Amino acid sequence: MSLNLDAMMTERRNPASAAIDTLSTLDILNLINAEDSKVAPAIARILPQIAQAVDAVSAAFARQGRLIYCGAGTSGRLGILDASECPPTFGTPAGQVIGVIAGGEPAILQAVENAEDNPQAAQDDLQRLALSSRDVVVGIAASGRTPYVLGALRYARGVGATTVALSSNPDSPMAPLADILLTPIVGPEVITGSSRMKAGTAQKMILNMLSSAAMIRSGKVYGNLMVDVEATNAKLVERQIRIVMEAGECDRATAVEALERSQRQCKTAIVMVLSGLSATEAQALLERHRGFIRPALDER
């Protein structure tokens, strides 16, 4: 079956870059930068829809559900990137945020021929994850018509999972399969059809919003501090200390002692410092308030 590329926004020629091959290096960069500046306003226009998606994800987390990104090529890699950052940043359990890419692990580093054209493969991948109605599936495809992503959304809808479609083409085939439709219209690319550029930038920004805002809504952030950060390297050990110092308004020695007594749990250490409770008492208080620091402290 042939595709009508002319009908797709992401495949149209951009008149602003029609002679880009004749420009100086600096002028090429100025043009790319000018086109990139259109991405944030495009996202601003769909913030209400992004908010709906965030609320759906945080609700899924509250019922022990998962956020699952599905995509092919750049779109799949961006989902994996966002998912992989959640455990160290927010202390999420393995498997709470998952990135699935057409072609599997080999496709992370290089293109896998025809992988994106197989909708059944998406169903198989989601079945292996035991997808359920508790989960949220975000299908990512700049074109809005990638068969693998369409297959993922179709299967997800069939099992009752919440479906979110992220595309840069209006009226895409993904739309009827989505409970929530995210369509940042960034316009034609500087290099025709290279949707890793503006469309990919929009995807990255929106995925940042989805996961970060959902984690904030789930109590993973206090003020603007990542209070569930895991100390997996020297930099993050130091970050934990600084977080407890700032949130607890205490000196370094107090923060270090609280972290040691709480087995390096930032939230517990913060509540200990601010309330005077023991580690066991602070942890129990946090558990009563589903890990949210503010209501835990209010109870004191």
Swiss-Prot record:
Single GO MF annotation: carbohydrate derivative binding
Keyword Lyase among UniProt keywords: yes
PROSITE patterns: GCKR, SIS
Biological processes annotated in GO: 1,6-anhydro-N-acetyl-beta-muramic acid catabolic process; amino sugar catabolic process; N-acetylmuramic acid catabolic process; peptidoglycan turnover
Chain segments annotated as coiled-coil in the UniProt record: none
Pathway annotation from the record: Amino-sugar metabolism; N-acetylmuramate degradation; Amino-sugar metabolism; 1,6-anhydro-N-acetylmuramate degradation; Cell wall biogenesis; peptidoglycan recycling
Active-site residues from the entry: 85 (proton donor), 116
Up-regulation conditions: Induced by MurNAc 6-phosphate that releases the repressor MurR from the DNA. Repressed by MurR in the absence of MurNAc 6-phosphate.
Keyword Cytoplasm: no
The reaction(s) this protein catalyses: N-acetyl-D-muramate 6-phosphate + H2O = N-acetyl-D-glucosamine 6-phosphate + (R)-lactate
Alphabetic keyword roster: Carbohydrate metabolism, Lyase
Source organism superkingdom: Bacteria
Gene3D superfamilies in the record: 1.10.8.1080, Glucose-6-phosphate isomerase like protein, domain 1
This enzyme's EC code(s): 4.2.1.126
Enzyme class: lyase
Pfam families: GKRP_SIS_N
Domain SIS: 57-220
Role summary: Specifically catalyzes the cleavage of the D-lactyl ether substituent of MurNAc 6-phosphate, producing GlcNAc 6-phosphate and D-lactate. Together with AnmK, is also required for the utilization of anhydro-N-acetylmuramic acid (anhMurNAc) either imported from the medium or derived from its own cell wall murein, and thus plays a role in cell wall recycling.
Subunit-structure text: Homodimer.
Family affiliation: Belongs to the GCKR-like family. MurNAc-6-P etherase subfamily.
Other facts: A lyase-type mechanism (elimination/hydration) is suggested for the cleavage of the lactyl ether bond of MurNAc 6-phosphate, with the formation of an alpha,beta-unsaturated aldehyde intermediate with (E)-stereochemistry, followed by the syn addition of water to give product.
Protein name: N-acetylmuramic acid 6-phosphate etherase
Lineage, uppermost ranks: Bacteria, Pseudomonadati, Pseudomonadota, Gammaproteobacteria, Enterobacterales
Gene responsible for this protein: murQ
